[in-house]
């Protein structure tokens, strides 16, 4: 039986470039090579595609240790120097000519998780893992995600949305408007970034100004939300027409919230699988995850994140990630492992879901 050629896309033009590489390294290491042939395609910071040679080398680079010892900016600069040193010509973007049967997307954030890459692959006639164009674009926007899931009956945190252009034009007025609508402590989030990049927890006006400045520099729209005091619970969802929800996972941040360092460097957060909540509450969270998944039109996979309010036990949606982290310490593969699906089988199942006739 001939093997299926899988184009593994990673890197990309988002702020999550380096994490995408680490996710791709784990995916490549767990790919069933008896069924699949790997064609790694690395997308540089500037958007060039580098196939096979340098891309394959990059999959064996110990990037996680580099991130631990330096800033993201320093790591990005080092990667760009590696690309220049490789002096490899960009590859052909005709995926059919490259013999690609299916694409595995390990591209986090903008230009990979937001529907643009999905749309490109649709026009090429190449099936791909994860959600389709609409769900990818919709869930990338935290503000629109909240509107959709609230309409489906799922609770969301109180908040407001800010256009960066409005803030830059009149910061004092926008800050006053925020304070009139949302109580401290609050969170300031770029609407369309993941991995906690650009997120700040704010306790007063003095902290609000730099938080909004930082978020507005990263995105054209910013979400401001009230803090939900309670447990952070996550669920991995897998499937197309008949999705399944994993056991719940729980995050106990080592800091005020689960930031970039804790997500990918494993510094201080504690992870609990299953979550330390009653089984009845776990069932409610899983049902809510499936409701959100369907309401948003998701397919393939998504990680659905919630808060459980400590005073009321109400389940409040935090966000939905359609290409969740796939590093060795990422919650999605760990929750699936705890639900009886090994990392290797998870990769295979995602490729099978991508190739289902209804997805094509």
UniProtKB/Swiss-Prot annotation:
Keyword entries, A-Z: ATP-binding, Cell shape, Cell wall biogenesis/degradation, Cytoplasm, Ligase, Magnesium, Manganese, Metal-binding, Nucleotide-binding, Peptidoglycan synthesis
Listed cofactors: Mg(2+); Mn(2+)
Species of provenance: Chlorobium chlorochromatii (strain CaD3)
Protein name: D-alanine--D-alanine ligase
The enzyme's E.C. designation: 6.3.2.4
Residues engaged in binding Mg(2+) 1: 305, 319
Transmembrane portions of the chain: none
Gene3D superfamilies, alphabetized: 3.40.50.20, ATP-grasp fold, A domain, ATP-grasp fold, B domain
GO CC term (a single one): cytosol
InterPro entries: ATP-grasp, ATP_grasp_subdomain_1, D-Ala_lig_Van_CS, D_ala_D_ala, Dala_Dala_lig_C, Dala_Dala_lig_N, PreATP-grasp_dom_sf
Domain ATP-grasp residues, every copy: 146-352
Protein residues bound to ATP: 179-234
Keyword Transmembrane helix: no
Main location: cytoplasm
Gene Ontology biological process terms from the UniProt entry: cell wall organization; peptidoglycan biosynthetic process; regulation of cell shape
Coiled coil: none
Cofactor note: Binds 2 magnesium or manganese ions per subunit.
Subcellular locations according to the entry: Cytoplasm
Protein purpose: Cell wall formation.
């Amino acid at each position: 039986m001939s093997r299926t050629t899988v184009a593994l896309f990673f890197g990309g033009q988002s702020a999550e470039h380096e994490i995408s590489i680490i996710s791709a390294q784990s995916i490549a290491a767990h790919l069933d090579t008896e069924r699949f042939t790997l064609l790694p395609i690395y997308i540089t910071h500037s958007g060039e595609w580098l196939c096979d040679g340098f891309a394959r080398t990059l999959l064996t680079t110990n990037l996680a240790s580099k991130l631990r010892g330096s800033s993201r900016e320093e790591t990005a600069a080092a990667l760009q120097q590696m690309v220049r040193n490789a002096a490899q010509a960009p590859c052909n973007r005709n995926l059919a000519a490259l013999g690609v049967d299916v694409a595995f997307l390990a591209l986090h954030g903008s230009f990979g998780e937001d529907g643009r890459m999905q749309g490109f692959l649709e026009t090429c006639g190449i099936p791909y893992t994860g959600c389709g164009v609409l769900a990818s674009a919709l869930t990338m926007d935290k503000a629109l995600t909240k509107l959709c899931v609230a309409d489906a009956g799922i609770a969301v945190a109180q908040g407001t949305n800010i256009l960066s252009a409005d803030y830059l034009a009149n910061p004092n007025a926008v800050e006053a408007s925020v304070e009139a609508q949302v109580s401290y402590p609050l969170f300031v989030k770029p609407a369309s970034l993941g991995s906690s990049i650009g997120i700040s927890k704010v306790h007063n006006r003095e902290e609000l100004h730099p938080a909004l400045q930082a978020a507005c520099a990263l995105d054209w729209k910013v979400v401001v939300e009230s803090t939900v005091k309670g447990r952070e619970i996550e669920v991995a969802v897998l499937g197309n027409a008949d999705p399944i929800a994993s056991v719940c996972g729980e995050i106990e941040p080592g800091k005020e919230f689960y930031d970039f360092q804790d997500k990918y460097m494993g510094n201080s957060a504690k992870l609990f699988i299953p979550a330390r909540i009653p089984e009845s509450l776990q069932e409610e969270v899983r049902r809510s995850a499936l409701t959100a998944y369907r309401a948003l039109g998701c397919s393939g996979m998504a990680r659905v994140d919630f808060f459980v309010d400590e005073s009321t036990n109400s389940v409040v949606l935090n966000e939905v990630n359609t290409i969740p982290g796939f590093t060795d310490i990422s919650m999605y593969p760990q929750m699936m492992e705890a639900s009886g699906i090994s990392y290797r089988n998870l990769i295979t199942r995602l490729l099978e879901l991508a190739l289902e006739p209804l997805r094509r």
